Amino acid sequence: MANSNNFSKTNAQQVRKQNQQSAAGQGQFGTEFASETNAQQVRKQNQQSAGQQGQFGTEFASETDAQQVRQQNQSAEQNKQQNS
């Protein structure tokens, strides 16, 4: 079976025109999306989020009674040794 190579000519002028249009379109989208982001608002939200993380850390830490945990661990260890 013969292998026939079909070459099509590339229109360099057409390619340049498409590249220019594409580059122009990217600029429009870049500006459009960038203008929708309020940097000051994002900073404010990040600060609020960081402050809330501290509150949750304190809240959960205060629910743990370290002395009670130590006693439970000691009792469990004693029971383990008795059953061995």
From Swiss-Prot:
Residues 1-25, 34-44 have a biased composition (Polar residues). Residues 45-57, 71-84 have a biased composition (Low complexity). Pfam families: SASP_gamma. Keywords: Repeat, Sporulation. Induction: Monocistronically transcribed in the late sporulation phase and cotranscribed with mutY and/or fabL during exponential growth. However, sspE is not translated during this period. Belongs to the gamma-type SASP family. This is Small, acid-soluble spore protein gamma-type. It comes from Bacillus subtilis (strain 168).
